């Protein structure tokens, strides 16, 4: 969750899911016996993939402790309205920085959103996510990935090939059934893959099924009033996706 800074309600959702699954380990969540799933499959979370960017979105550039970063940030596009910041503290959009369909310096200049970076996986956050995915893949324990963004109340499940495509479609159909979210697969289909997309990287380079859910319906940052509805639709989602992939 929270690869885009202003989408920090996804981190709140991930933490609430973790708490629910642990609290109900000997019971059930929405009819799913938690122990029966977690005794067979580990679920790895990255609740907040972009902590520095989230600090900017929540509290402003002044709360970034590194003096050089602060100085550079004040000169970037979006510095005057940091609540809607998406990038990390180096002005790189982490969902354009993965080593999949990457284009250097795509999106103009460093700023609040859209800039892909000078090279693929140039950012420490991107490296950390890729490192965990590779480790799990090498251990033959990676069965699937759920990617949380905001907003739109839609699910993305297109792309991939062979078994990855088949398993992704299974995850996608289940996610739509659980949440009632609309299909996002028509978005961007005519323009081809996105530059440096994390989901494309997971499916094409890591060779793992992956879906993306966009939570909420208001502009980001999502208002806290939306969380109860998001929670009702998503509490059991990761647990049920894990059960599906057993």
Predicted segments with their positions:
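Short beta-strand element of the alpha/beta-hydrolase
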Residues: 1-4, 146
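Active-site/substrate-binding loop(s) of hydrolase catalytic cores
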Residues: 8-12, 16-161, 212-219
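Generic recognition of short, well-ordered alpha-helical segments
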Residues: 9-13, 166, 225
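MPN/JAMM (Mov34/JAB) isopeptidase/deubiquitinase module and associated MPN-bearing subunits/adaptors
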Residues: 97-98, 203-204, 237-243
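Catalytic cores of processing enzymes, dominated by hydrolases/peptidases
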Residues: 154-219
């Amino acid at each position: 969750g929270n690869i885009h800074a202003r989408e920090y309600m996804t981190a709140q959702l991930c933490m609430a899911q973790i708490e629910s699954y642990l609290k109900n380990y000997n019971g059930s969540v929405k009819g799913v016996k938690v122990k029966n799933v977690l005794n067979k499959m580990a679920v790895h979370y990255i609740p907040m993939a972009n902590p520095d960017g989230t600090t900017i979105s929540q509290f402003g550039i002044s709360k970034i402790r590194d003096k050089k970063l602060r100085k550079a940030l004040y000169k970037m596009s979006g510095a005057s309205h940091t609540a809607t910041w998406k990038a990390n503290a180096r002005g790189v959009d982490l969902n354009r920085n993965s080593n999949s369909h990457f284009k250097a310096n795509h999106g103009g200049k460093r700023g609040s959103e859209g800039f892909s970076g000078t090279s693929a996986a140039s950012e420490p956050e991107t490296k950390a996510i890729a490192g965990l995915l590779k480790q799990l893949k090498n251990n033959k324990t990676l069965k699937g990935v759920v990617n949380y963004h905001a907003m739109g109340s839609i699910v993305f499940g297109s792309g991939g090939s062979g078994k990855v495509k088949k398993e992704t479609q299974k995850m996608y159909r289940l996610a739509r059934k659980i949440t009632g979210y609309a299909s996002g697969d028509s978005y961007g289909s005519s323009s081809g893959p996105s530059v440096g997309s994390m989901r494309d990287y997971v499916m094409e380079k890591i060779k793992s099924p992956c879906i993306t859910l966009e939570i909420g319906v208001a502009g980001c940052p999502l208002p806290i009033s939306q969380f109860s509805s998001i929670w009702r639709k998503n509490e059991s989602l990761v647990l049920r996706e894990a059960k599906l992939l057993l």
